[in-house]
């Protein structure tokens, strides 16, 4: 049931946090935004509400699988560690056991999420300005003005990617399989230690918030533990998240970065060390409600099934 509960929790989390995720990605990849509110105002003015939901369909379709694998891997890994070390899956795991299982959960996610992350970032950073710039570049290169079949076509330039699946196909055709796994090195570094932090902090907070005489926390305890675990995980994940987003967005025009280290050095040299923490406040603000919902849904499904089976 860990897989089913994780899938339901993941879908609930995406529904809550996607608009702020779009804002976060744009702040991290586009220097024109002075801050969170500037990005929100500019996105709404140019693209209205739909601009905050660009690329949503693919995460919704895949998040159930990814979240299911994350929670399932964590609990199965933890069970195997406890059986190997203590002879029983019911033994209380140590903090090191939880950390190792959480890290394994994060690393497994990368193979599933990298292509969808590339599509999500490309669609989220595909603005009207970029579309217009690409049209102008094509006109300049050809030496002739772009011909518009209709006045509407000139006013509304066609975006490069028409949707998540089209984006994946286009990236694979233009950049090969490596294009779909662009930024996966940064994603590995982000997911490994952030999910170790995520599950360890949740387990510790649940233990602290469990009332005396009870075996598990109440709903309020789960809400607080889940929200705080999400904030702590994103606090340690943000530097690599910035690099990951820049590497994955680096395919909509000139290729600026040769790899992970070059992206880190170039970003810090041009924008200072603070660039690695772009979107940190937004990540933390988004993480609290999203992970409250994820863990409440997850725990609710587990407790419901346990009550039905006993």
Swiss-Prot record:
Gene3D superfamilies: Mitochondrial carrier domain. Pfam families: Mito_carr. One of its GO terms (cellular component) is mitochondrial outer membrane. Specifically expressed in liver (at protein level). The keyword RNA-binding does not apply. The chain crosses the membrane at residues 3-23, 55-75, 98-114, 194-210, 219-239, 280-298. It comes from the Eukaryota. It catalyses: NAD(+)(in) = NAD(+)(out); acetyl-CoA(in) = acetyl-CoA(out). Its main location: mitochondrion. GO terms for molecular function: acetyl-CoA transmembrane transporter activity; NAD transmembrane transporter activity. Mitochondrial NAD(+) transporter that acts as a 'metabolic gate' in hepatic lipogenesis. Provides NAD(+) substrate to mitochondrial SIRT3 deacetylase and enables its NAD(+)-dependent activities in mitochondrial energy metabolism. This triggers downstream activation of PRKAA1/AMPK-alpha signaling cascade that negatively regulates sterol regulatory element-binding protein (SREBP) transcriptional activities and ATP-consuming lipogenesis to restore cellular energy balance. May transport other mitochondrial metabolites having an aromatic nucleotide and phosphate groups, such as acetyl-CoA. This is Solute carrier family 25 member 47.
């Amino acid at each position: 049931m860990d897989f089913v509960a994780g899938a339901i929790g993941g879908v609930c989390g995406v529904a809550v946090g996607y608009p702020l995720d779009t804002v976060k990605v744009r702040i991290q990849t586009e220097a024109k935004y002075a801050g969170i509110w500037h990005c929100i105002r500019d996105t709404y003015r140019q693209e209205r509400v739909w601009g905050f939901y660009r690329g949503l369909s693919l995460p919704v379709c895949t998040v159930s699988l990814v979240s299911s694998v994350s929670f399932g891997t964590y609990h199965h890994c933890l069970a195997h560690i406890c059986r190997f070390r203590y002879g029983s899956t019911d033994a209380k795991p140590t903090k090191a056991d939880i950390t190792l299982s959480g890290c394994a959960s994060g690393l497994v996610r990368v193979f599933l999420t990298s292509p969808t992350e590339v599509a999500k970032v490309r669609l989220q950073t595909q603005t009207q300005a970029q579309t217009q710039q690409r049209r102008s570049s094509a006109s300049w290169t050809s030496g002739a003005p772009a011909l518009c079949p209709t006045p509407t076509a000139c006013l509304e330039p066609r975006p490069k990617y028409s949707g998540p699946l089209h984006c994946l196909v286009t990236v694979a055709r233009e950049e090969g399989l490596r294009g779909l796994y662009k930024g996966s090195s940064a994603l590995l570094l982000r997911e490994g230690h952030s999910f170790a932090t995520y599950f360890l902090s949740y387990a510790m907070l649940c233990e602290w918030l469990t009332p005396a005489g009870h075996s598990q926390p109440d709903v309020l305890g789960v809400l607080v533990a889940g929200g705080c675990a999400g904030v702590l995980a994103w606090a340690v994940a943000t530097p690599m998240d910035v690099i990951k987003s820049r590497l994955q967005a680096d395919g909509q025009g000139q290729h600026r970065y040769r790899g992970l280290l070059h992206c880190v050095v170039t970003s810090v040299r041009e924008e200072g060390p603070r660039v690695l923490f772009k979107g940190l406040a937004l990540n933390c603000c988004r993480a609290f409600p999203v992970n409250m919902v994820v863990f409440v849904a997850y725990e609710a499904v587990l407790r419901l099934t346990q009550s039905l089976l006993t």
